[in-house]
């Protein structure tokens, strides 16, 4: 006889009158007037089990049950008595009258109630096995599974083939820090865990596998944030003989179908925005279009004001001055403005200038701000005109290097838009807001090392007609790169790749990678590109981020079964941990500070 006939959460009226065998965990046991009720739980949900004292042996077993006991129940599906149904459950119209009850395994008292919504992340991650039993986590894991299956089916129908690429590869230190794996066989040499399968998938294109994908782990040893993990899962795709528009069309359709099937959400149109436009209007390459606030450019009109806070960046190369008008913002208190001032300092801003607009018609006299006295009438009039200010508005200002202004005022835009004030005053639209950001710069200037660095990676193709700009004007060289953005999150990013060895060598030269270094690090790619490499490009989605957005989870750690903390630790297994001296000797490794390793 099968140990189980049905999942608990899938027992419905369709099984009325049938005998079922269920396995699961005791979520709750209730004793009501001599009858014991058990809420039995498995990954699909709950079912109510009724234990009647008429079956003495079974009833005695039921009396000994406690939360999280693992049990097997055999019983009759029947309708719940009138007035006791639960419309919130799939099984809420029925109950199972227990005939047989077996305890498969007892449980010690759990360290927390599974329905406790106020657990610290440390408690949850230390007791991850129990945390994963919670319905919230099980819903997340099931959505992740269903999404991955749908993605695989979609790509299969589109002619993509799943090919695995190596986990142990060559270190290329130009990007983020690698996770290194020492070789026991080759003394003093190391593998690197992949930050992405980028070069392998390009070589698969050269090899003729014109539509490739895999759902794979990638690794980056970088500082963690709420949406970052040292190991993460990527939906990695590459195609040959498709241009940018065709690549974007395929993957827009994939994401649109996933949201419709899994969430019954129509994402609608994906507007297209250039990187320059996104940075100019929102200070970000992944703008959250739900927030209805935009920058107003003021750099030109601030060049001749006496206020050096504005005039200095306005007249300095690479400087920028912008305004952010907050409709109705004059009701924001001085204390809240002070909090916003401290907030923008996180992003390098020295402070936050502001003007409250009490009465536009009065010009200077209708404004409230400590900076008004430093601005001439023409500048004030132009600020009010360009921002479209109205009575009751608040205007914030950012003035500094362009990056600091974009980062700080861009973050302020989101902070205000997502605040209670923003939501109450129509500054935030509760909707899904997808878009494509295109025409990224090919290079960005590394001021510390006085050299150009690749914005995405050095294998991205320049836009048509921009190849010579790599040498003559790298600041204005644009790339065939594109990001899919949703609600201010980068869901996926990709590009058309360089498929000619001579162009790839030019990019290495622009990045000041010598021919010798290029040959040592990427010789296998340069060689492959000489064998009739096809035009190719691709895109990769972060599966963890995608599921975080779809579930509305507060943290990416809520959609990963066994995540790391923000200190890159696994609290369940206590990884990383010291290793045996013998293991180190076999790897020809000696620790500089053995005591530090044992102390963590």
UniProtKB/Swiss-Prot annotation:
Residues 198-201 are annotated as: Aspartate. One of its GO terms (biological process) is aspartyl-tRNA aminoacylation. One of its GO terms (molecular function) is nucleic acid binding. The record marks 32, 83 as: Important for tRNA non-discrimination. GO terms for cellular component: cytoplasm. Aspartyl-tRNA synthetase with relaxed tRNA specificity since it is able to aspartylate not only its cognate tRNA(Asp) but also tRNA(Asn). Reaction proceeds in two steps: L-aspartate is first activated by ATP to form Asp-AMP and then transferred to the acceptor end of tRNA(Asp/Asn). HAMAP family: Asp_tRNA_synth_type1. This is Aspartate--tRNA(Asp/Asn) ligase. It comes from Delftia acidovorans (strain DSM 14801 / SPH-1).
């Amino acid at each position: 006889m099968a140990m189980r006939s049905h999942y608990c959460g899938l027992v419905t009226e369709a099984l009325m009158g049938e005998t079922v065998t269920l396995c699961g965990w005791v979520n709750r046991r209730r004793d009501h007037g001599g009858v014991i009720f058990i809420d039995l739980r498995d990954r699909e949900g709950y079912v109510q089990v009724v234990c009647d004292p008429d079956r003495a042996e079974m009833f005695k077993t039921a009396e000994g049950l406690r939360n999280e006991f693992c049990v097997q129940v055999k019983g009759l599906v029947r309708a719940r008595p009138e007035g006791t149904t639960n419309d919130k459950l799939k099984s809420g119209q029925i109950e199972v009258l227990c005939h047989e009850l077996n305890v498969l395994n007892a449980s010690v008292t759990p360290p927390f109630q599974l329905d406790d919504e106020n657990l610290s992340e440390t408690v949850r991650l230390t007791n991850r096995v129990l945390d994963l039993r919670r319905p919230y986590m099980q819903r997340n894991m099931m959505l992740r599974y269903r999404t991955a299956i749908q993605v695989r089916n979609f790509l299969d129908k589109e002619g993509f083939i799943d090919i695995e690429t190596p986990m142990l590869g060559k270190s290329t230190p130009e990007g983020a820090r690698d996770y290194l794996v020492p070789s026991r066989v080759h003394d003093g040499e190391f593998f690197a865990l992949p930050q992405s399968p980028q070069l392998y998938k390009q070589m698969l294109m050269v090899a003729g596998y014109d539509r490739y994908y895999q759902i794979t782990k990638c690794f980056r040893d970088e500082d963690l944030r709420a949406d970052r993990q040292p190991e993460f899962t990527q939906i990695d795709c590459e195609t040959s003989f498709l241009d940018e528009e065709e690549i974007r069309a395929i993957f827009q359709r994939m994401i649109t179908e996933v949201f419709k099937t899994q969430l019954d959400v129509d994402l609608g149109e994906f507007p297209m925005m250039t990187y320059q436009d996104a940075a100019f209007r929102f200070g970000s390459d992944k703008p959250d279009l739900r927030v209805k606030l935009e920058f107003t450019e003021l750099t030109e009109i601030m060049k001749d004001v006496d206020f050096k806070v504005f005039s200095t960046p306005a007249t300095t190369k690479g400087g920028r001055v912008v305004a952010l008008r907050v409709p109705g913002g004059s009701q924001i208190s001085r204390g809240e403005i002070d909090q916003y001032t401290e907030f923008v300092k996180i992003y390098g801003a020295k402070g936050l200038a502001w003007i409250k607009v009490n009465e536009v018609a009065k010009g200077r006299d209708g404004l409230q701000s400590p900076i008004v006295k430093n601005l001439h009438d023409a500048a004030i009039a132009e600020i009010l005109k360009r921002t479209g200010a109205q009575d009751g508005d608040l205007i914030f200002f950012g003035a500094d290097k362009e990056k600091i202004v974009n980062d700080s005022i861009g973050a302020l835009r989101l902070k205000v838009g997502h605040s209670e004030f923003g939501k109450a005053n129509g500054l935030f639209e509760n909707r899904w807001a997808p878009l494509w950001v295109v025409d990224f710069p090919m290079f960005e200037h590394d001021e510390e090392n006085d050299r150009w660095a690749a914005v995405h990676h050095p294998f991205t193709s320049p836009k048509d007609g921009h190849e010579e700009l790599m040498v003559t004007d790298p600041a204005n060289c644009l790339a065939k790169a594109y990001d899919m953005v949703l609600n201010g999150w980068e869901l996926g990013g990709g590009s058309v790749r360089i498929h000619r060895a001579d162009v790839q060598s030019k990019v290495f030269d622009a990045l000041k990678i010598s021919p010798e270094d290029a040959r040592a690090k990427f010789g296998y790619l340069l060689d492959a590109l000489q064998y009739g490499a096809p035009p190719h490009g691709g895109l990769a989605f972060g599966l963890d981020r995608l599921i975080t957005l779809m579930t509305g989870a507060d943290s990416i750690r809520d959609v990963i079964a066994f995540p790391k903390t923000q200190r890159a630790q696994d609290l369940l297994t206590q990884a990383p941990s010291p290793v045996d001296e013998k293991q180190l000797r076999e790897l020809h490794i000696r620790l500089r500070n053995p005591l530090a390793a044992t102390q963590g």
